[in-house]
């Protein structure tokens, strides 16, 4: 599963 930083990067 993606890391928190990667999740925010998609936004």
UniProtKB/Swiss-Prot annotation:
- Can you say what this protein is called? Substance P
Q: Note the PROSITE patterns from the entry.
A: TACHYKININ
Organism, scientific name: Cavia porcellus
Q: Which family does it belong to?
A: Belongs to the tachykinin family.
Localization (cell): Secreted
Q: Which gene encodes it?
A: TAC1
Task of the protein: Tachykinins are active peptides which excite neurons, evoke behavioral responses, are potent vasodilators and secretagogues, and contract (directly or indirectly) many smooth muscles.
Q: Identify one Gene Ontology CC term for this UniProt entry.
A: extracellular region
Keyword Secreted assigned to the entry: answer is yes
According to the UniProt entry, the coiled-coil residues are: none
């Amino acid at each position: 599963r993606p890391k928190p930083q990667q999740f925010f990067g998609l936004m």
